[in-house]
Design a protein with these regions (language model features):
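Glycine-rich FAD pyrophosphate-binding loop
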Residues: 23-43
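FAD/FMN-dependent oxidoreductases across multiple families
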Residues: 236-325, 330
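Short beta-strand to alpha-helix junction loop
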Residues: 92-116, 236-241
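C-terminal helical "tail/cap" subdomain of flavin- and related membrane-associated enzymes
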Residues: 320-436
Length: 436
């Protein structure tokens, strides 16, 4: 496309959705991606109940359903000591999402479908094009990108606005020094697909261990997404053998290994990470960040695809406003407002994610929290509803919820302490002689 209004770098959910929203309003949009679709992507491949609303708006929900997407009714979480709790999306708390179930679908299907919707709206999509740098004018304003084609050709492409939807290791974010790597938690993930895993149900599963965690979820057509997330310091243990490491990790878990005895891995093992990246702001003059390029903390809550879609929905109106602005100052103000609205939208969820990330990193804390949530189903439902993006984070980020969690944890520990006291007392007694 010649003279686009917006260049979108990245054709994943964030980029495709942004292109769809923009093109539908008459903007000239060029989407660039270094991959050729369909392509696989290491991801939990889970879309929360609220993500279905945006898919429906894009007329993408029906094609995804027809492609065989799996449906999830909630989440089951197992702590390191074996305590398990379950949260359901449909629950007594009364909050309801756009859908009563989450959706799980292979990225090979999802991304191709969303890109097709962007094309149908009028966006130009170029595959096999890698963005290598940004173009800036004399004042430092972004005016386009430099690209490298599969044939080795270099090209400069210009546009009034650029969208960085190029993921966790965003080239644009790095070039503009917008990204910050957090020190905690530093994790990486190994992701693959199996068929034939036993006892797979209509729930997503998270199995937390002392040295990482595993996620298991059906993604339709008999395939099951399996992700093992480990501390980044354990990367050396992979030793170039991702599949072997993942197999050994699962085999070492007595509660998981039997379920895989007749399973067959059907896709290569992909690696991604380290995670915990956050842009100190999601815009700069002439450019805006969306999706993982703007923020990605940890995959445990599986919010990445919803955040990408919702972020694109927030960004598109700001880009249109920026394009029609009467001055550079007003154009930048529109991007600043996007950043503010994004922070307002996701701030509560970010706090919940970080609290969960802390619990996952400390086995004692995770065991204690799991014990409370296993006894308080209504609290587990609320927490899973927040993760499902339809229960407001304030429902768990309040004194009442935290107090109930702590009190229940203390009450749950009390019988154990009494048992220990009795055991210790009995250990010091001399058994009475039997009566004759």
């Amino acid at each position: 496309m010649k003279n686009p209004d917006v260049i979108v770098v990245g054709g994943g959910p964030a980029g495709a959705a942004c292109a769809w929203f923009l093109a539908g309003q008459g903007a000239r949009v060029s989407v660039l991606d270094r991959a050729r679709f369909p392509r696989d992507k290491p991801c939990s491949e889970y879309l929360s109940p609220e993500a279905s609303r945006i898919l429906s708006v894009m007329s993408a929900l029906a094609p995804i359903e027809e492609a065989g997407a799996a449906h999830l009714s909630g989440m089951r979480i197992r702590s390191p000591n074996g305590t398990t709790f379950q949260g359901d999306f449909v629950a007594a708390h009364g909050w309801r999402g756009y859908s009563d179930r989450g959706v799980a679908i292979r990225r090979t299907i999802l991304d191709a479908c969303l890109l097709d919707r962007a094309r149908a709206a009028g966006a130009s999509v170029e595959e096999g094009v890698r963005v290598t740098d940004v173009i800036r004018d004399s004042r430092g304003r972004v005016r386009g990108v430099c690209t490298l084609g599969e044939d080795g050709s270099n090209r400069e492409r210009t546009a009034p606005l650029v969208v960085a939807a190029d993921g966790l290791r965003s080239v644009i974010s790095r070039r503009l020094c917008l990204a910050r790597r957090a020190r905690f938690p530093r994790r990486l993930a190994l992701v693959t697909h199996y068929e034939g895993i036993e006892d797979v149900s209509g729930y997503g599963e998270m199995h937390v261990e002392k040295d990482g965690y595993a996620g298991i979820a059906p993604v339709g057509n008999g395939a099951v997404n399996v992700a093992v997330v480990i501390p980044a310091r354990g990367a050396a243990a992979l030793a170039g053998d991702r599949a072997g490491f993942l197999g050994r990790w699962i085999a070492a878990r007595p509660h998981l290994a039997p379920r895989f005895r007749n399973a067959r891995r059907i896709t290569p093992v992909h690696a991604t990470g380290p995670f915990a990246s956050h842009a100190h702001r999601a815009w700069a003059p002439g450019v805006a960040l969306v999706g993982d390029a703007a923020d990605f903390f940890d995959p445990f809550t599986g919010e990445g695809i919803y955040a990408a879609l919702r972020g694109a929905e927030l960004l598109a109106p700001a880009l249109l406003q920026s394009l029609s602005a009467s001055s550079v100052v007003r154009a930048d103000a529109a991007l600043w407002e996007y950043d503010e609205s994004r922070n307002k939208e996701f701030r509560g969820k970010w706090r919940v994610e970080r609290l969960i990330g802390a619990a996952v990193s400390v086995p004692l804390l995770m065991n204690t929290a799991a014990g409370s949530l296993s006894r308080r189903k209504e609290m587990a439902d609320l927490l899973v509803g927040v993760a499902g993006d339809f229960v407001p984070p304030r429902e768990v980020l309040n004194v009442s919820f935290v107090t109930r969690l702590v009190v229940d944890a203390l009450l749950g520990m009390a019988p154990l302490e009494r048992h220990r006291s009795v055991t210790a007392a009995n250990a010091g007694r001399v058994p009475a002689s039997p009566a004759i």
